[in-house]
């Protein structure tokens, strides 16, 4: 029996327990989850890609089959009404025989309009959970998406079972493979469209399989927060690359973002490295008992410090925050819950009745304000951008005088930076799935080798690897340094703690392994 099969037993027991609790509280006979229906395009005979009801796929990994139903009361084995038509035009799904099938009483549905025979006869005290209210009404349901039931399920969706965490680790593994392929395509000078194709091939996803539409942006396009266009022609000069792309496994999402500088040199490369350090520090601040909004405020402080340190704004970090300047350069929230949905539900909830957890003052548009607790999964995605419209708004204010507009003009062609990981909060530790689950290939050991002879498991441009405390055959200063690899030029730099990087090797390195940092 595979690991997922073992974990699934506990998962279904958890869902049964939650269902039993809410139907007792609301005096219901049960809950009916509808997977959904295919939607036909207007004035056409083709359908939009099917997207399953997330509350349905919480129960089982059936994400591509409309007209399915689950009837659950928390005590009896749930009934799965599985749509399996007679159809010579399309591929018909196989009868369920995977590990999860044993946990359901399964009845096959040949025609969608025959489902009434398989649903409870008296539906007065059954809650319908789904999108198609007109279908529910026609079938005799009176309670459709009742707010107390929805709030209860949404609140508890934030607490992942071990099965769900295992699925999310797999989704991250898939996404990491895509990111590696996309990164390599960027350094080969490919177009946005070609980079997207490399990503899809590496993940073995179609665009419809992805958890969301990928953002693949080069140069100035990195400043467009939700850039979903793919230029077919490569730019004359590659400067920067921002990729926000995920994956799907059993209906669970990964959501990863990386930013690269093409040359690995210059101020934008330093800016990327600085934002990476802040992103890792913010990830490490996740802890049970904190409000997620507190991390968002700290992120603004860090962005302000970066703006000040790089002389983009001629003020101290505290002054930049006080004047509200950071919102021009960092206009979105720090992150969100992730799970069955990329922006998973329950992020604003203070309790299972649906009470709203207020955001920090001055930040009304956050996707997550909730108290952090164990078994929750978050994204952490700080950013720093040079967005024309927001810079124009800033220029029209009194804060205009504090901006180094020449520096802004130098950095605008790079667009912006965003770095994003997916993190599990445990009772006494954190698990950064994105970084800890990166693929590791065999490398030469650092121990006892001279600098030009080793390779490092780190693909990111100007990424850092602090080597073991055991000495290399170099002077003490070098022992305390950080080695930096630029994968396109395959040069090794060493960054001393107080000095600028110096080149210590220019000869070709052994093959650099491919992970994601």
Curated annotation (Swiss-Prot):
GO MF terms, alphabetically ordered: aminopeptidase activity; aryldialkylphosphatase activity; diisopropyl-fluorophosphatase activity; metal ion binding; metalloexopeptidase activity; proline dipeptidase activity
Note on how the cofactor is bound: Binds 2 manganese ions per monomer.
Thermal properties of activity per the entry: Optimum temperature is 50 degrees Celsius.
Catalytic function, reaction form: Xaa-L-Pro dipeptide + H2O = an L-alpha-amino acid + L-proline; diisopropyl fluorophosphate + H2O = diisopropyl phosphate + fluoride + 2 H(+); An aryl dialkyl phosphate + H2O = dialkyl phosphate + an aryl alcohol
pH dependence per the entry: Optimum pH is 8.5 with DFP as substrate.
GO BP annotation list: proteolysis; response to toxic substance
InterPro entries xrefs: Creatin/AminoP/Spt16_N (IPR029149), Creatinase/aminopeptidase-like (IPR036005), PepQ_N (IPR048819), Pept_M24 (IPR000994), Peptidase_M24B_aminopep-P_CS (IPR001131), X-Pro_dipept-like (IPR052433), X_Pro_dipept (IPR022846)
Keyword Manganese carried by entry: yes
GO cellular component, one term: cytosol
Sites where the protein binds Mn(2+) 2: 244, 255, 420
UniProt entry keywords in alphabetical sequence: Detoxification, Dipeptidase, Hydrolase, Manganese, Metal-binding, Metalloprotease, Protease
Biotechnology (record note): Can be used for the catalytic detoxification of some nerve agents neurotoxins.
Enzyme nomenclature, EC number: 3.4.13.9, 3.8.2.2, 3.1.8.1
Family per record: Belongs to the peptidase M24B family. Bacterial-type prolidase subfamily.
Other information: Has a stereoselective preference for isomers with R-configuration at the phosphorous center of sarin and soman, and with S-configuration in phosphotriesters.
Assembly behavior: Monomer.
PANTHER family for this protein: XAA-PRO AMINOPEPTIDASE 3, XAA-PRO DIPEPTIDASE
Record-given protein name: Xaa-Pro dipeptidase
Annotated organism of origin: Alteromonas sp
């Amino acid at each position: 029996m595979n690991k997922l099969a073992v974990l699934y037993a506990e998962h279904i027991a958890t869902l049964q327990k939650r269902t039993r609790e809410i139907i007792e509280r609301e005096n219901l006979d049960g809950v009916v989850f509808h997977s959904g229906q295919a939607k036909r395009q207007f004035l056409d005979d083709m359908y939009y890609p099917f997207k399953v009801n997330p509350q349905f796929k919480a129960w089982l990994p059936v994400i591509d089959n409309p007209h399915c139903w689950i009837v659950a009361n928390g005590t009896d084995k749930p009934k799965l009404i599985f749509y399996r038509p007679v159809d010579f035009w399309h591929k018909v799904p196989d009868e369920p025989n995977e590990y999860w099938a044993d946990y359901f009483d399964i009845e096959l549905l040949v025609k969608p309009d025959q489902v009434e025979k398989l649903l409870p006869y008296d539906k007065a005290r059954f809650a319908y959970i789904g999108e198609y209210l007109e279908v529910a009404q026609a079938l005799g349901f009176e309670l459709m998406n009742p707010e107390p039931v929805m709030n209860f399920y949404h609140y508890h969706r934030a607490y992942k079972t071990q099965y769900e965490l295992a699925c999310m680790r797999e989704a991250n593994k898939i996404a990491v493979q895509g990111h590696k392929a996309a990164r390599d395509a960027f350094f080969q000078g490919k177009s946005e469209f070609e980079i997207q194709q490399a990503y899809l091939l590496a993940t073995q996803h179609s665009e419809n399989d992805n958890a969301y539409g990928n953002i693949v942006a080069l140069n100035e396009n990195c400043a467009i927060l939700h850039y979903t266009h793919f230029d077919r022609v490569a730019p004359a000069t590659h400067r920067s690359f921002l990729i926000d792309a995920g994956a799907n496994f059993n209906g669970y999402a990964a959501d990863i973002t990386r930013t690269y500088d093409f040359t690995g040199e210059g101020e934008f490369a330093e800016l990327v490295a600085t934002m990476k350090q802040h992103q890792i520090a913010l990830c490490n601040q996740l802890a049970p008992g904190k409000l997620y909004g507190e991390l968002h405020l700290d992120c603004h402080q860090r962005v302000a410090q970066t703006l000040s340190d790089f002389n983009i704004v001629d003020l101290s970090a505290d002054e930049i925050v006080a004047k509200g300047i950071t919102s021009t350069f960092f206009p979105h929230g720090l992150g969100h819950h992730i799970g069955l949905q990329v922006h998973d539900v329950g992020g604003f909830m203070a309790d299972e009745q649906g009470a709203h957890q207020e955001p920090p003052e001055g930040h009304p548009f956050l996707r997550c304000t909730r108290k952090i607790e164990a078994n929750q999964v978050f994204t952490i995605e700080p950013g720093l951008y040079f967005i024309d419209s927001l810079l124009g708004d800033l220029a029209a204010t009194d804060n205009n005088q504090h901006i180094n507009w020449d520096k802004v003009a130098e950095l605008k062609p790079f667009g912006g930076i965003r770095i994003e990981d997916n993190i599990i909060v445990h009772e006494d530790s954190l698990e950064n799935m994105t970084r800890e689950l990166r693929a590791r290939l065999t490398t030469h050991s650092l121990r006892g080798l001279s600098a030009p002879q080793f390779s490092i498991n780190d693909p990111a441009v100007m990424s850092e690897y602090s080597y073991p405390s055991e000495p290399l055959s170099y002077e003490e200063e070098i022992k305390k340094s950080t080695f930096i690899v630029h994968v396109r030029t395959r040069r090794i730099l060493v960054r001393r703690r107080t000095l600028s990087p110096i080149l210590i090797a220019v000869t070709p390195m052994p093959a650099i392994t491919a992970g994601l940092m």
